Amino acid sequence: MIFNKLYGGFTMKKAKTAVALGAFIALGLGAKVEAETVPQTGVNRIHFINTKGSPGTDAILLESNGHYALIDMGEDYDFPDGSNPLYPFRGGITTSNFYAIEDRLFRHLDQVGVPKLDFMLGTHVHSDHIGGADEVLQRYKVDKFYLKRYSDDRITSQGGLWDNLFNYNNALNAAKKYGVNVVQDISDKDSHFKLGDMDIQLYNYKNEYGPDGKLKKVYDDNPNSIVAVVTVNGKKIYLGGDLDNVYGAEDRLGPQIGKVDLMKWN
């Protein structure tokens, strides 16, 4: 996604630098964390997991006063080989292990000392955002998983289908297998919650439907990205997945969100 204008009254800053959150630190890409054996209390940090050779891959760890959550889980190693007609092999599907951050994500979570995740949020169904969801659900206890509904039928561009349904179904099947509460129809009440000291407000979280009662047609799943705005220690951080302005989402949300201190988007 390319952000080609100021987002309402937003202040845009590079996400690749360490940013002070009051007395605490939001870790930048590539920042190292010393191993911890127990969760840290009184600490508020946002970890932007190193994305190696894939600038679009997202996995963001929220850490607040001994509580943890993931926004996106990054690219993993698996992809459809075409043997199942439900998941055809299409051009554009990521097949190179070079782009997978599954091992890196787990290593980082273990170094931090994450015992469980209060929630996971999949911004949208592209593999570089939720490819690793099923692996995370297998490895860690997760209380809640936010993920909007998806269907291949809603994507109008063949070039935007990739392995979306494969990732989506893998994530939901894993959540069901491990008894995780999945929230797919996010209500206004569901959209605002706390993680330790962090106040989290979701935007663009509602499933949109057309006159036929089916999910509204879109060219690609990027416009469906859930936005999370985290406020902690007087600072506001925008985590936007791959949201774009093709259907005017940026114009609509900018005035609602207002000025932020840090933006992270792809």
Q: Model-flagged regions — what are they?
A:
Residues 6, 10-35:
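Sec-dependent N-terminal signal peptides of Gram-positive bacterial secreted proteins and lipoproteins
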Residues 36-115, 184-265:
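Core dinuclear metal-dependent hydrolase active-site scaffold
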Residues 115-128:
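Metallo-beta-lactamase
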Residues 120-123, 148, 266:
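Conserved residues at the C-terminal ends of beta-strands
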Residues 122, 130-139, 155-168:
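Metal-dependent catalytic neighborhoods of phosphoester/phosphodiester hydrolases
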Residues 137-141, 255-258:
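Short, conserved loop/helix-junction motifs that constitute active-site signature segments
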Residues 140-144, 178-180:
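A short helix->loop->beta-strand "cap" motif at the edges of active sites that frequently abuts
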Residues 143-152, 264:
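Short internal beta-strands
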